[in-house]
């Protein structure tokens, strides 16, 4: 059921990282219920913006796909490119933390998502970057195993897998209602700022 319910504890994590996160959340909520420990859970999307390593249209952190798009080359996306990722500016993540502190009376014992208003598919993301760099999109699609061979890096392929296997969307209505959360940046603004930061720092080269 979408959007994901942040208060549903039946999350069935897929890896040790996810299991550890869920165990931490359950422990903190139990400590709040039993002992009044002042716990609030904040769960960010993919934190991005200037200076951050941004999740790319492959769902990992490889520079290759961004450079290929910047050069106007063809890229391949896994499956049909319809998996969803969630960029959020670091400023807005900090805003959720700060608002949880200033709205302590309603935030204790609760879980909140730190997200932008919208999310984006891998395909939509890739198209946006082609437009950002002034090129026509050149995108093809490969089945998962074939795409992993194309990507060529086992660790990066695994990184992609865990980013896209539980594709979905989030609602920030609870954050707006209880914390008066008002995201300053859209996900596309956040992506653009991060990519421009890559260019400014010489991590991505652009032909003039």
Predicted regions and their residues:
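Non-catalytic, hydrophobic alpha-helical segments
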Residues: 93, 97, 114, 125, ...
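Active-site Tyr-X1-5-Lys
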Residues: 9-41
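A conserved structural motif in NAD(P)-dependent oxidoreductases
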Residues: 86-93, 186
């Amino acid at each position: 059921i979408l959007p994901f319910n942040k208060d549903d504890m039946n999350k069935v994590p897929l890896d040790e990282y996810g299991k550890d996160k869920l165990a931490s959340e359950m422990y903190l909520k139990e400590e709040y219920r039993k002992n009044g420990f002042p716990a609030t859970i904040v769960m960010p999307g993919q934190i991005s913006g200037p200076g951050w390593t941004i999740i790319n249209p492959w769902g990992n952190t490889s520079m290759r796909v961004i450079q290929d798009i910047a050069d106007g080359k063809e890229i391949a996306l896994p499956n049909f490119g319809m998996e969803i990722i969630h960029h959020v500016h670091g400023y807005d993540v900090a805003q959720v933390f700060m608002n949880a502190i200033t709205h302590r009376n309603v935030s204790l014992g609760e879980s909140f998502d730190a997200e932008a208003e919208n999310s984006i598919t891998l395909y939509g993301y890739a198209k946006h970057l082609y437009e950002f760099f002034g090129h026509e999109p050149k995108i093809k699609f490969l089945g998962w195993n074939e795409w992993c061979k194309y990507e060529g890096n086992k660790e990066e392929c695994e990184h992609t897998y865990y980013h896209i296997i539980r594709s979905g969307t989030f609602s920030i209505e609870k954050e707006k209602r209880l914390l008066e959360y008002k995201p300053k940046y859209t996900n596309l603004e956040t992506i653009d700022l991060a990519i421009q930061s890559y260019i400014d720092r010489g991590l991505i080269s652009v032909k003039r």
